[in-house]
Curated annotation (Swiss-Prot):
<feature type="short sequence motif" description="Switch 1">
    <location>
        <begin position="71"/>
        <end position="89"/>
    </location>
</feature>
<feature type="binding site">
    <location>
        <position position="110"/>
    </location>
    <ligand>
        <name>GTP</name>
    </ligand>
</feature>
<keyword id="KW-0813">Transport</keyword>
<comment type="similarity">
    <text>Belongs to the small GTPase superfamily. Rab family.</text>
</comment>
<feature type="modified residue" description="Phosphoserine">
    <location>
        <position position="244"/>
    </location>
</feature>
<dbReference type="GO" id="GO:0030670">
    <property type="term" value="C:phagocytic vesicle membrane"/>
</dbReference>
<keyword id="KW-0547">Nucleotide-binding</keyword>
<keyword id="KW-0007">Acetylation</keyword>
<dbReference type="GO" id="GO:0005929">
    <property type="term" value="C:cilium"/>
</dbReference>
<feature type="lipid moiety-binding region" description="S-geranylgeranyl cysteine">
    <location>
        <position position="257"/>
    </location>
</feature>
<dbReference type="InterPro" id="IPR001806">
    <property type="entry name" value="Small_GTPase"/>
</dbReference>
<keyword id="KW-0206">Cytoskeleton</keyword>
<keyword id="KW-0968">Cytoplasmic vesicle</keyword>
<dbReference type="GO" id="GO:0060271">
    <property type="term" value="P:cilium assembly"/>
</dbReference>
<keyword id="KW-0460">Magnesium</keyword>
<dbReference type="GO" id="GO:0031985">
    <property type="term" value="C:Golgi cisterna"/>
</dbReference>
<keyword id="KW-0970">Cilium biogenesis/degradation</keyword>
Length: 259
């Protein structure tokens, strides 16, 4: 029985969404990894379509984490929002290259007194979104500690990182240029992809979350292919012979499009 909501028409991805700035991107390919495209075409994505991928959103109080999520999930902006207590989450369903894919977006509290509660929900994240206010230099500096706290509960080598500057609508062009320079430096140090958004106007919000969904999906499919490949390599059949014991690795012939 399928208990997940159907995929909305505006959540269908047939192409790889592009990064905002090539100077700070997880990768700059124009298309999905060839192995991912091939696996989707041949329906070899394993359990990816049944999994729910966890994405946590962290950052200082009032940087706009909740507004960012609400703008994408509900297409709303509430100027009189209340600070998140502990954690909250939204579920978003996508279809990527014909495969269903779900993201669970965890909105965590930025207040110090709720930090210990929120941190218990960090574990198992496949992507971490660190949000700062483009008009507040201190909030950018604090992103380093937020990331460090989140990585205590996750494997740094297997999680995707995104550094997101919010409230772009409040920055003058000159102010933004200066802040972006610092933000790109921080993103490079973190090995994170940089984005700048406005939850008020909606600028870059949709594009950003589509990028998160696409890259998380891509990572999931590649991991699934790696696991299935390991299982085939490990499937060893022992053959008895008069002269010696021979070992033959039983493996299926790979499709021509997948190296």
């Amino acid at each position: 029985m399928n208990i997940l909501a159907p995929v909305r028409r505006d959540r269908v991805l047939a192409e790889l969404p592009q990064c905002l700035r090539k100077e700070a991107a997880l990768h700059v390919r124009k298309d999905f990894h060839p192995r991912v495209t091939c696996a989707c075409q041949e329906h070899r994505t394993g359990t990816v379509g049944f999994k729910i991928s966890k994405v946590i959103v962290v950052g200082d109080l009032s940087v706009g984490k909740t507004c960012l999520i609400n703008r994408f999930c509900k297409d709303t902006f509430d100027k009189n929002y209340k600070a998140t207590i502990g954690v909250d989450f939204e579920m978003e369903r996508f279809e990527v290259l014909g495969v269903p894919f779900s993201l669970q977006l965890w909105d965590t509290a930025g207040q110090e007194r709720f930090k210990c509660i929120a941190s218990t929900y960090y574990r198992g994240a496949q992507a971490i979104i660190i949000v700062f206010n483009l008009n507040d230099v201190a909030s950018l500096e604090h992103t380093k500690q937020w990331l460090a706290d989140a990585l205590k509960e996750n494997d740094p080598s297997s999680v995707l990182l995104f550094l997101v500057g919010s409230k772009k609508d409040l920055s003058t062009p000159a102010q933004y240029v200066l802040m972006e320079k610092d933000a790109l430096k921080v993103a490079h140090e973190m090995k994170a992809e940089y984005w700048a958004v406005s939850s008020l106007t909606g600028e870059n919000v949709r594009e950003f979350f589509f990028r998160v969904a696409a890259l998380t999906f891509e990572a999931n499919v590649l991991a699934e292919l790696e696991k299935s490949g390991s299982r085939r390599i490990g499937d060893v059949v022992r053959l008895n012979s008069d002269d010696s014991n021979l070992y033959l690795t039983a493996s299926k012939k790979k499709p021509a499009c997948c190296p």
